[in-house]
A protein has these predicted regions:
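Bacterial N-terminal signal peptides
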Residues: 1-7
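Sec/Tat signal peptide C-region and signal peptidase I cleavage site
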Residues: 9-11
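Accessory terminal and edge-of-domain segments that mediate assembly/interaction
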Residues: 13-246
Length: 246
């Protein structure tokens, strides 16, 4: 067996490239989506694809420290696909924020995702502008089969002893965020009369919600609150918990 290696004289090393001198790209809006089903374009859409296609996010920038490359159009709209769950989202947003190619100092951020809604409040296909954003993962959880008989749920707020214990802490530790209400109202007023997409399949599904007038309406735009977490949940009991928690 013969071992060999290549060596390059020190003086012949390639000179270092000069740092980039191009001014950073000014970003007007960052649209954040969590997941995509397949490719960015041309197949079944998830959260990201319709933004890419309809906003013509045709310029691609690799983002090695993030989950996915970013895409941008000529109007300053940038699309960011973060991947599912908090860790990927945090890493992707940080990767973009620290990237010297982009100037985000004047950028507005839209977190645009698919979520469930209470049939007492919204119908399938409706759009909700959030006033408050709640992290449903922060707290304590006791198995519902082992909780006291008078407890409505096994979820307990952080540093509390019982479900929904009052008063709410004056200093929250990441459990909830209040968005700029003037800005939210501006967005709502601008979009409240927009006709949203509908289909026969959606209409047939809405008809199943007898006794829930809002759930049987055509898709509409509304203001509300949103709660997110790492677990997808469903059902009347979980819905009651989410409303009370919010």
């Amino acid at each position: 067996m013969t071992l060999g290696f290549l060596a390059c004289p020190l003086g012949a090393q390639k000179p270092r490239e000069k740092p980039r001198t191009d001014p950073p790209i000014k970003v007007k809006v960052v649209v954040v989506s969590m997941f995509e089903v397949g490719e960015d374009t041309g197949d079944i859409p998830g959260e990201y694809q319709l933004w890419v296609e309809r906003e013509h996010l045709e310029q691609i920038f690799p983002l090695p420290a993030g989950y996915h490359h970013v895409r941008m159009n000529k109007d300053g709209v940038l699309g960011l696909l973060t991947g599912v769950a908090t860790a990927k989202a945090a890493a992707s947003v940080m990767a973009l924020g620290l990237d010297p190619r982009f100037d985000l100092s004047k950028a507005y951020w839209i977190v645009a995702g698919i979520g469930g809604g209470d049939p007492a409040d919204v119908s399938l296909g409706s759009a909700v502008w959030a006033n408050h954003v709640i992290d449903g993962d922060i707290g304590y959880e006791i198995d519902a089969r082992e909780i006291p008989a008078d407890w409505p749920t096994g979820f307990v707020p952080l540093r509390k002893a019982t479900p929904y214990e009052q008063p709410v802490k004056s200093q929250l530790d990441g459990e909830a965020y209040t968005l700029n209400q003037d800005f939210v109202n501006w967005a709502y007023q601008l979009t409240k009369n927009v006709s949203l997409a509908d289909s026969d399949k959606m209409r047939n599904t809405r008809m199943l919600y007898v006794g829930f007038p809002n759930a049987m309406k055509l898709p509409f735009v509304v203001r509300g609150d949103t709660m997110s977490g790492g677990t997808f949940w469903h059902g009347k009991k979980m819905d009651e918990w989410a409303n009370a928690w919010t």
